[in-house]
Amino acid sequence: MRKMMQRFAEARIIIPAPQNGRDEIAQADAEAAIREAFGGFTRIEGFGSWMADDGTIYREPVYVYDIAAPLLMGAGEDAGREWAGAMTALRRIAAQIARDMAQECVYLRSPAGRVHFVKPDGTDYYQDVEPHPFPRVSG
């Protein structure tokens, strides 16, 4: 039987910086959930901006959480279960943050590099939405 090797891939969750006591509690709860599921994280303070569908531009300080998500390297069901477990935990944490901080969605980058915008119910924001076309850049 071939021995499984433990490897890690980076996941990322981005949340708005807390604005009030309720947000600070939600942030502390999220950090506890990340530590419990993955053993720890690195938090970086940053700045984010996004444009709503109506054209309104939002700018806000954010916290970026980099998380080492364990991935079993090897064949078989154990590797698949490990991957599914990491994604389930990440999605659950992102949805919890969205609920607790009253966010429409929370940015989650999976260990495979795919970006999700997770809604409070745990589904992807863009799951049933037609993607926006990229604007043409002249040059």
Model features per residue range: what roles?
Residues 1-139:
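Positively charged, small/polar-rich N-terminal and surface patches that mediate targeting and assembly
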